[in-house]
Every structure is written in structure tokens, then in C-alpha cells.
Amino acid sequence: MAVYSTNEFKNGLKVMVDDAPCSILDCEFVKPGKGQAFTRIKIRNLKTGRVVERTFKSGDTLPSADVADVEMQYLYNDGEYWHFMVPDTFEQYAVTENVLADAAQWLKEQDVCVLTLWNNEPIQVTPPNFVILAITETDPGLKGDTSGGGGKPATLETGAVVRVPLFVQTGELIKVDTRKGEYVSRAKE
């Protein structure tokens, strides 16, 4: 297993902290006027989702987390588990809702997303950055109703609710940024 020194820490690096796989979100090298230099990192526990801040003296090391990001296709939800499949090997994984978290509102059947596996167990699901979904319910846009220009809420086919411009109607396909949960543009079929 690889070991990373504090000078090798960078954003996105996956390491083991307190016997749990973590991803480094932010890394800062601090050299105070007096005393030894240290590295302050902000990490997200991949199993629980908690974000904590830790400091390490220069020269400290952390073991790498044996995690793998695998592209998988979302198959279906049986009420209790969400089922995913590796397209090349047809290997299937069942994921609980607490692992899926917010990704559930952006997934529809046959979508390809990234599952993070640790000890061959799914611990995180990352939806694609952009998805195209149909609007199932929104208020009708009235002609000339442009004051404020803020938009209106729209319910998508997966149950997610996003703010859309006034000209968008029920039944249209839209492109949504899953990282921010925002409307990007109209989409063609």
C-alpha cells in the first residue's frame, strides 16, 4: 500500500484516516514565524460524509485508501436498494439510500455514473455532471410576466425540484448541473 507524505497531499487525494477512507477537500501548507511548519487539510470521510479539519507536522505520512472509482450503469430501484451494473463485466452492486444520498434525485434508469468502491463495497455514488431530464410539473408562463426574472420551480421526472426560466413549459427536456442543482439550458431529444 502506498504512503503519502505531507508534501504530496493535494485536493482529491484519497487517504486512510482513523481506519476510514477519506478524500482531501482542501490542503494548506502553513509556515508560522516561530515553530515547525505544518499542513492543514480538510477531509471528507467517504463512509459517513462528515467533513473534518486535521493538521499534520511536516514529514508525517498517511496510507493511501484502497478505493476505486468505477463507471457503472444504474439499472433500477426495488424500494430498498438501488441496483448498478458494470457494463463490461455485468457485475452488479446493490446500494442503500444512505450511500446514494443526494445522487438519487438525478438518476434515471440506464444512466451511467461513478461508484466509489472500498473493499469491494460501494461507499459513494457520483452522478454525471450534467443530466437531461423532463419536466413533469411547473406553472404556466404567462405572456409579459417577466418582472423580477427570477424563474419558477419545476418538478422533474426523478422528483427533483429546480428553478427554471419562465418560458420553460411542462413536458420539455432540460439540462441540469447536478453539482449545483441548477438549470443550464433546454435540451433536444
UniProtKB/Swiss-Prot annotation:
Record carries keyword Glycoprotein: no
NCBIfam families, per database record: efp, PRK00529.1
Name listed for the protein in its UniProt record: Elongation factor P
Disulfide partners: none
Family to which this protein belongs: Belongs to the elongation factor P family.
One GO cellular component term: cytoplasm
Modified residues (N6-(3,6-diaminohexanoyl)-5-hydroxylysine): K34
PROSITE patterns: EFP (PS01275)
Pathway(s) this gene product operates in, as recorded in its UniProt entry: Protein biosynthesis; polypeptide chain elongation
Role played: Involved in peptide bond synthesis. Alleviates ribosome stalling that occurs when 3 or more consecutive Pro residues or the sequence PPG is present in a protein, possibly by augmenting the peptidyl transferase activity of the ribosome. Modification of Lys-34 is required for alleviation.
InterPro entries reported in the protein's UniProt record: Elong-fact-P_C, NA-bd_OB-fold, Rib_uL2_dom2, Transl_elong_fac_P/YeiP, Transl_elong_KOW-like, Transl_elong_P/YeiP_cen, Transl_elong_P/YeiP_CS, Transl_elongation_fac_P
Keywords: Cytoplasm, Elongation factor, Hydroxylation, Protein biosynthesis
Annotated transmembrane regions: none
GN (gene name): efp
